[in-house]
Structure formats: C-alpha cells, structure tokens
Design a protein with these regions (language model features):
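Short coil/turn segments at beta-strand junctions that form active-site/ligand-binding loops
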Residues: 37-38, 107-111
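Second-shell loop/turn segments in exported
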Residues: 46-51, 80-89, 110, 219-222
Length: 249
C-alpha cells in the first residue's frame, strides 16, 4: 500500500512539473505582449513565497520605478518549491523565454534581474547560456541578488547587508550542488560591473559552512533593511538610467 501511494505521489508530482514547464511559454508570451518600455525589472522570488513580487526586493523595485520613469516590472512564474533543482529550472526557463521574446519584440528595451534565495539561483540558471556575444548580454544592465545560494567569493559587486565586505569571501550552499551553472558562467557578469550580490552576515544560504546552524534569521533581513533596499535601488537606477529608447522603435 505504501509503495503504491509513493508511486502515485511521484506520478502526481511529475504531472505538476510538466504542467509548470508547459505554462512557461504561455506566461512569458502574455507578459512580453504588454508593450515596450525603456526597461523591465524581472523579479524572482524565494522558496515558498507566493506567486508575485518578492517581499525582499519589492521596496527597491518600487523605488527604482518611481525614480526612473518608463519602466515596469514582471514576476517570474514558477513553483518556488522545495524541489529546488526542478523548481529553479522551471523559473530559469520562464526568465530565459521572457528575455528572448522581449528582445525580439522590443530590441531597445533594457533589463534588470532581481533574485532572492532560490530566485537568485533561477537568475543564474537563466543566464547560463547567455554569452558575451549574445544581444541579451548588452540588454541586461543590472543583476541584484539577495541571499544567493550560488554566491562566489571575492567577485566585484559582493557586499553585505551594511554595504561592507564582511561576506566578500563567502560561498553559497549551492555552489557544490548538482545544477550549479559554474563559476565561468557567473564571473563575466560580475567583472562587467553588472552584479550587486548582497549577502547578509550569517546568512547560511549565501555564506555556507559545514558548521552553519539552522538559524535562517539572517536570510530574512533583506526585506526589513532600509540600507539593503536603498543600495539595491541605487544600483538599479544607475545601471538602467542610461539613454534608452522604446523597444518598438
């Protein structure tokens, strides 16, 4: 009886994953069809957050949209479940399709990618096959990550939640896990000055060690930190604030 129940659960989960993957193109088409803007901020939420804006990045995105006219935001459509690799893969496919359709429809439109927790992994996975010669590399002006499980040590853009360097040498828990895109996929974006990677001191998601406790309190500080929200908004505004034209022109 237990075996049959387990088999049924596995089958049900596989159907859910297929359905989520099938919805990627549909949602990307709906969002990219909304018209061209000077820029779009794509927001990928963390594990178990409800579909919609992430609580950790909502403030900085609102500040950016208010300070820099002509933009809009989109929220990545994906499960954000504890099935990390499957869930993040669905999100990455959605983001990549959104970007490809967007640059085809609105070639002058700029992009910023913002990711929190699993949403940061979604972001890196979505960019894994975007080379420096890809038009998307030029179109993507900014990447802001909070509590990144793929955080790499000593890269440009690494700061802590007080804009210091206490976590500059940190490595995320996902770096040695199956599914890590590889440092060679991440480093060029950072060296181009396009990345602000904020890792709070003690956040074991982005500052992992074998002795890490199970206290996830530091992973939750981003949403309530005015300094984090201001730093993110400042970075986004600076990177997106160059001369832009409507994508349809």
């Amino acid at each position: 009886m237990l075996a049959s129940s387990t088999a049924f659960l596995t089958f049900a989960l596989s159907l859910l994953n297929v359905a989520e993957a099938a919805s990627v193109n549909k949602h990307a088409e709906l969002n990219s069809a909304a018209g061209c803007h000077d820029y779009v901020i794509i927001d990928s939420r963390a594990t178990t957050e409800a579909q919609g804006p992430s609580v950790a990045s909502k403030g900085m995105i609102q500040k950016t949209l208010s300070a820099l006219p002509g933009g809009t935001s989109a929220q990545t459509v994906y499960p954000a479940s504890f099935q990390f690799q499957v869930s993040a893969g669905v999100g990455a496919a959605w983001v990549h399709n959104y970007l490809k359709q967007g640059i085809a429809s609105c070639p002058k439109q700029k992009y910023a990618l913002v990711g929190y927790g699993q949403g940061a992994a979604v972001t890196w996975k979505a960019l894994a096959n975007v080379g420096t010669d890809d038009p998307l590399h030029e179109a993507i002006k900014a990447i802001v990550l909070l509590g990144d499980p793929y955080h790499l040590p000593h890269l440009p853009g690494n700061i802590d939640d007080h804009e210091g360097n206490s976590t500059d040498g940190a490595q995320g828990f996902g770096v040695k896990e199956v599914g890590f895109p590889g440092s060679e996929k991440i480093t060029p974006w950072a060296k181009d000055g396009k990345v602000l990677n904020i890792c709070a001191l003690g956040d074991q998601v982005c500052q992992y060690s074998k002795s890490s406790s199970e206290d996830f309190g530091p992973h939750k500080v981003y949403k309530s930190s005015a300094q984090v929200q201001d730093a993110g908004a400042k970075f986004l505004t600076q990177k997106l604030g160059g001369k832009a034209g409507k994508g349809a022109e």
